[in-house]
């Protein structure tokens, strides 16, 4: 099924752009984002200040999916800094999932047969609802030294059957880094599945390179990729094409959504999201 999108000259240029170039060109100034979307800066002064609590970062392909002049656009609301972020709520916990005490660098081992490995601390887009915005990534740096410690831990725990690559966003790692890591995971005999949780292809579809697809195609591990898509407006032709490349090499595609007030907390919106996900081969 083909998903129609508006013809956009900037989008045409970016079809052939390198994902790292697009990432480097991401918008980090709230005022620039407001200018692009033709929204009045004076109405967002207090929200702009919340940038100091958590930086704004939005790749331009994702901005192109937003409706200009609409302050209630569901994609804009996910990334724009908010005045409400200054509210100090009684009982609020900066580590709600108790993730800051780890058995080894970069890992979370909550469940008997699977383990989460934080590949990289950064993301291509900073979502305002991020529950790891306070995670001490400086103590869990995404480098080969820490990955090797995680690999040693996995090798010493034969009950682990599945490794989940997370972050941050694991696809912030370059293809050669992922190749290094995945090949070493393959060498651990008790591992059978690899799960990759990522939002990067949603905001920069060019991240799904031929080299990355080949790495997954060559792996002995059963591979699943879980996208993070919250609204049907995030899905377009370029994302569809990227997902098709993954399906063609046998990757199982799933989606994880966050229920967000005034963004997707409506049955009709969620139904439309599920239908679009099915259309591009992703199981909601």
Predicted regions and their residues:
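Flexible, acidic/Gly-rich N-terminal and inter-domain linker regions that tether
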Residues: 1-109
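N-terminal pre-triad scaffold of radical SAM enzymes
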Residues: 55-58, 101-131
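Conserved catalytic-core segments centered on acid/base and nucleophilic motifs
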Residues: 117-118, 163-165, 170-171
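Short, glycine/serine-rich, charged loops/turns that create anion-binding
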Residues: 123, 135, 170, 201
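Iron-sulfur (Fe-S) cluster-binding segments and ferredoxin-like electron-carrier domains
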Residues: 130-142
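Surface-exposed cleft-lining segments at the edges of enzyme active sites
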Residues: 137-139, 167-168, 196
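Conserved AdoMet/S-adenosylmethionine-binding subsite of the radical SAM
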Residues: 148-162, 171-284
């Amino acid at each position: 099924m083909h998903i129609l999108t508006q013809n956009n000259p900037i989008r045409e240029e970016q079809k052939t752009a390198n994902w790292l170039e697009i990432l480097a060109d991401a918008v980090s100034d709230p005022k620039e984002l407001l200018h692009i979307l033709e929204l009045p800066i004076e109405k967002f002064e207090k929200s702009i200040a919340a940038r100091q609590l958590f930086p704004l970062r939005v790749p331009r392909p994702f901005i192109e999916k937003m409706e200009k002049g609409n302050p209630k656009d569901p994609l804009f609301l996910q990334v724009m800094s908010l005045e409400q972020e200054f509210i100090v709520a009684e009982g609020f916990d900066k580590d709600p999932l108790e993730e800051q005490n780890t058995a080894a660098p970069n890992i979370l081992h909550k469940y008997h047969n699977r383990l989460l490995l934080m590949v990289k601390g950064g993301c291509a887009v900073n979502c305002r609802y991020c529950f790891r915005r306070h995670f001490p990534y400086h103590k869990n740096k995404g480098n080969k030294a820490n990955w090797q410690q995680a690999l040693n831990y996995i090798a010493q725990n034969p009950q682990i059957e599945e490794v989940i690559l997370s972050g941050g966003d694991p696809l912030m790692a370059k293809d050669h880094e992922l190749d290094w890591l995945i090949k070493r995971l393959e060498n651990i005999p008790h591992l059978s599945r690899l799960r990759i949780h990522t939002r990067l292809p949603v905001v920069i579809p060019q991240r799904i390179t031929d080299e990355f697809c080949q790495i997954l195609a060559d792996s002995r591990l059963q591979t699943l990729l879980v996208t993070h898509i919250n609204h049907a407006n995030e899905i377009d032709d370029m994302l569809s094409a990227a997902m098709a490349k993954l399906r063609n090499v046998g990757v199982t595609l799933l989606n994880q959504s966050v229920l967000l007030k005034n963004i997707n907390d409506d049955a009709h919106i969620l139904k439309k999201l599920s239908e679009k996900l099915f259309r591009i081969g992703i199981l909601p």
